[in-house]
Amino acid sequence: MALRLDGKALAKAVESRLQAQIESNLPQAGRPPGLAVLRVGDDPASAVYVANKEKACARIGVASYGAHLPSSTPFAEVLSTIQQLNADPRVDGILLQLPLPEGLDEGPLLMAIDPEKDADGLHTLNLGRLLKGEQGPRSCTPAGVMAMLRSQGIDPAGQRAVVIGRSILVGQPMALMLQAANATVTVVHSRTKDLVAHTREADIVVVAAGRPGMVGAEHIKPGAAVVDVGIHRKPEGGLCGDVRAAEVEPIAAALSPVPGGVGPMTVTMLLVNTVVAWCRRHGVDHDLADLLS
């Protein structure tokens, strides 16, 4: 039976560290960290995600500055809102909640966010910093995956790792982080021939394909660590991931559940990026570097 990579429990432990960091540095900083979440439109899933982030902020003492614009908002107004948040001295982290309504190009809007306030780690400058091994905000989901592996003593160094999916949101930064941890990394995707031949050789498999139940027992070698980034609503109710967990659990050494795996750590890493940015702005020390390496 696979070890459970419990993202919910780890997120709670990291939140405790963040809360202690805030309490320690608040007298010198003079104000709490601030996270602004910009939501455009009325996507129901986005509303739930934003509410979860606001609750997480409240738990650890981060001030939350939400902004909600109607779906009819023109590009120029969304851009202006981002620029206002860039200039707001209370705000240390900015998140543009995706997806955006049809007709709004997310690329230029993400690039308009001040790289030092880029709570999601998606700005081109911060992806470049990741590539070069420099300090900066890290992409939240991949950073959360790395923290989950480390928390269970799973060291990628010298291991074969396969990342399924090549999105800029997860797949590509995930591959860079695993490489930085000295894994030998292969990225596979929808055009890859003989997917099983690649995944069956892997010691670590990160599945971020966005396809429900894509990965089963035939893809995984015995003893591998499997991280399921996918989350989908099943027609009959409930949630599932990209991995057929019932098949994989008996043969994997470790498996992240859905829900309760990567999702909670994605939110927590958003807070880590925000708190670290706050510390840097005020010239105070922090002990969170292990979460961003």
Swiss-Prot record:
Coiled-coil segments: none
SUPFAM superfamilies xrefs: Aminoacid dehydrogenase-like, N-terminal domain (SSF53223), NAD(P)-binding Rossmann-fold domains (SSF51735)
Pfam families: THF_DHG_CYH, THF_DHG_CYH_C
GO biological process terms on file: L-histidine biosynthetic process; methionine biosynthetic process; purine nucleotide biosynthetic process; tetrahydrofolate interconversion
GO cellular component: cytosol
Binding-site residues for NADP(+), renumbered to this chain: G165, R166, S167, S190, I231
Catalytic activity annotation: (6R)-5,10-methylene-5,6,7,8-tetrahydrofolate + NADP(+) = (6R)-5,10-methenyltetrahydrofolate + NADPH; (6R)-5,10-methenyltetrahydrofolate + H2O = (6R)-10-formyltetrahydrofolate + H(+)
EC number in record: 1.5.1.5, 3.5.4.9
UniProt GO MF annotations: methenyltetrahydrofolate cyclohydrolase activity; methylenetetrahydrofolate dehydrogenase (NADP+) activity
Family in the record: Belongs to the tetrahydrofolate dehydrogenase/cyclohydrolase family.
Protein name (record): Bifunctional protein FolD
Gene: folD
